[in-house]
């Protein structure tokens, strides 16, 4: 379990670091109900550059920086479109997809496919979520 606890209005994180925060909103009668979940910061490379689709294994996972720094993908096993995401239970991966365009992390959200960034075998993706920048090199 993650070192997170909370009271009525506060969330306390026992260990500083990177987390994925998911906020779910439901409507109960005329009131909104909010649920906040915390997950490990598991970011994945998927698609041709990872060797296949829907393979969310440790081999396709980015390294997580200590403190400030970059998340770094494994080396691309093939050339092609660079596709990245987080994987949440019961959510299609592409709904949490993001890519690198013009040196920035661009999130897909609910839209259509984005313009693609290409990578070559042996390269890696570098993501800095603090300043929303990314690179393929």
Predicted regions span which residues?
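Insoluble glucan recognition modules
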Residues: 1-137
